[in-house]
């Protein structure tokens, strides 16, 4: 009979409680930090959203109701304020802003996309200088060039025309838009471009068939940023346009305010109409905006 080997018996020691406590501390800190962030974002949302909600609610009130019940819902709703605001001049300002904003966006995005394509895919002398020139354009404020720009517009016969606003707006937005779109184009694979050249595509074909369809998020983002700047710009709109029939929303609201100093409900209805398009545009294109900003910041 074979002798039996002695086997050592092992006993598992319980894990000390202090290790469990150490693991719980980071989780507790993370929970407190997340709660603080949500509280901050909620307060920030109230600070941003409440003035807009107050403006919309007050647009449905009459002047007496605005002063007597400033922080509450309208005691009686007056949707006719919007009709009065539209008929008393907002319609003209609104359509002028739509024309100027649409043409500015098309010109800015198209020229910037062409320039960004050349800067991201071709090598030529002066390429670095052109990029520096774009950066320099970002540093030039409109106030600095106001006097010479006014003289140029007068000499070209553009004063009191839509082009007196469209061309300066596009000129000031193109440098930033070029850099933004170029960063996105750099993230597009060169293999796709090479395959298109092998299939017989020209540079124009590659641009229109590959780059533009793949760059919808950044193009929409550029359009939104340009539209926001153009729609709300005030200085050029008040200086380069003197004709009441050509004024855009920011400049026209000054005349609208002077004409309705006592009718606050109609005035706030006009302000609501002027603010609505950009808010709606951003809400509809929000997913493209976020994707465009995130992808456009990958490479520089």
Swiss-Prot record:
GO terms for biological process: transmembrane transport. Residues 94-285 form the ABC transmembrane type-1 domain. Keywords: Cell membrane, Membrane, Transmembrane, Transmembrane helix, Transport. It comes from the Bacteria. It is found in: Cell membrane. Probably part of the binding-protein-dependent transport system YurMNO. Probably responsible for the translocation of the substrate across the membrane. Belongs to the binding-protein-dependent transport system permease family. MalFG subfamily. This is Probable ABC transporter permease protein YurM. The lineage of its organism: Bacteria, Bacillati, Bacillota, Bacilli, Bacillales.
